[in-house]
């Protein structure tokens, strides 16, 4: 089931505000989806995700198929029961992960033959197999199996002819995914994925042919795959707003806070990216006033929180709770610097909570600005704040 309601639009851009109703709940859009590849957002308890305002998370079909496997998933009634998350989940098809295997895989019209990265077993992924796996996972949003068109391979930039060949196979796989999804009687929602590389004419053709198939929602794939930033922004400016206005639009694997704000202006409703969690584990912190490198020596004795405007557990602590009852203030940059330098696991846990809170709060502020008819003002203030530096 999927219902999308458009609540507001910005007259000066393609930005829009909506609600997305799925089998496991209602999602306010635009939204960022934290990535939980193996059925967990690294280092974060489901309760913490709830508290920071996560409405929907993403998990990975390929990796969950490898481990723990479908028998285990089926015994829990799907991914929600397995990971104890009662809100919506989106699963990607596994196509990007199979593509990432490089020499370990062989792509044919029927699907992808590859060696398991876990134990070397010979395996096969097809549109039908992907739909069967995602049906067992019982994710609220299912993605078609597609071929991720690379920007370049070993220094060779993908030509238009090569991108067309890849796009056309993804379109055939979209139809096969749709047929199998319906055959299985999956009660959730299947999204088609626009491909076409960095070629706008191919993107246009891909989206038109997918729209003819009448998917409940559409994604823009094949971006953030090694292309220069300006080319990614060109595709963002070209493709999302041309998709049907009455259906949700998802930009896959993007990106920085600036990318999210620009993506909303380009008409995107849904985003996912590993950046806030991966960067947190590697010492890069997102704040209202720019990015902070917690490993830098200048933070060794810094008493400030990561972001004085942030209300996350790392920055604000448990405000309003007495010290005797376990209350405390936020953690200092000095303490988080110390945890990082010592390799203590609490360090990346706290920075991950902060970065995810920052992303989710950014999307909340975007939604509020759209509700108030002030998205343009928000964009200007956001850019000025981020340019200040920390």
UniProtKB/Swiss-Prot annotation:
Its EC number is 2.4.2.29. One of its GO terms (molecular function) is metal ion binding. Gene3D superfamilies: Queuine tRNA-ribosyltransferase-like. Zn(2+) binds at residues 310, 312, 315, 354. The active site is at 92 (proton acceptor), 272 (nucleophile). One of its GO terms (biological process) is queuosine biosynthetic process. It catalyses: 7-aminomethyl-7-carbaguanine + guanosine(34) in tRNA = 7-aminomethyl-7-carbaguanosine(34) in tRNA + guanine. Substrate binds at residues 92-96, 146, 195, 222. One of its GO terms (cellular component) is cytosol. Keywords: Glycosyltransferase, Metal-binding, Queuosine biosynthesis, Transferase, tRNA processing, Zinc. Residues 253-259, 277-281 are annotated as: RNA binding. It holds the Pfam family TGT. Pathway: tRNA modification; tRNA-queuosine biosynthesis. Catalyzes the base-exchange of a guanine (G) residue with the queuine precursor 7-aminomethyl-7-deazaguanine (PreQ1) at position 34 (anticodon wobble position) in tRNAs with GU(N) anticodons (tRNA-Asp, -Asn, -His and -Tyr). Catalysis occurs through a double-displacement mechanism. The nucleophile active site attacks the C1' of nucleotide 34 to detach the guanine base from the RNA, forming a covalent enzyme-RNA intermediate. The proton acceptor active site deprotonates the incoming PreQ1, allowing a nucleophilic attack on the C1' of the ribose to form the product. Belongs to the queuine tRNA-ribosyltransferase family. This is Queuine tRNA-ribosyltransferase.
